[in-house]
Amino acid sequence: AKSVHHARVLIRQRHIRVGRQVVNVPSFMVRLDSQKHIDFSLISPFGGGRPGRVKRKNQKAAAKKASGGDGDEEDEE
């Protein structure tokens, strides 16, 4: 995280896990032996999960454009 505040936001948005447990409480006390198991959640876009809403929308638009246009254009004659 870029700052303490950013870390808090990542935790509240369920992007962080300790071991196999997803943490969403910023005051969660991590034991000393569990510190090495702090990682991004598997369902988080940061941890290799499904891309976020905006990225999926942009990928869909790029695929549509690559396949021959979006169909919204009208021919001007």
Curated annotation (Swiss-Prot):
Name the UniProt record assigns to this protein = Small ribosomal subunit protein uS4
The Gene Ontology biological process terms listed for this entry are:
ribosomal small subunit biogenesis
Gene3D superfamilies reported in the protein's UniProt record: RNA-binding S4 domain
A single GO molecular-function term is: rRNA binding
Enumerate the InterPro entries for this protein: Ribosomal_uS4, S4_RNA-bd, S4_RNA-bd_sf
The family note in this entry says:
Belongs to the universal ribosomal protein uS4 family.
Q: Where is this region: Disordered?
A: 45-77
What keywords are assigned to this protein?
A: Ribonucleoprotein, Ribosomal protein
Which Pfam families does UniProt cross-reference here?
Answer: S4
Q: Which GO terms describe its cellular component?
A: cytosolic small ribosomal subunit
Q: Which SUPFAM superfamilies match?
A: Alpha-L RNA-binding motif
Organism this protein belongs to: Nicotiana tabacum
Q: Where is the composition biased (Basic residues)?
A: 52-63
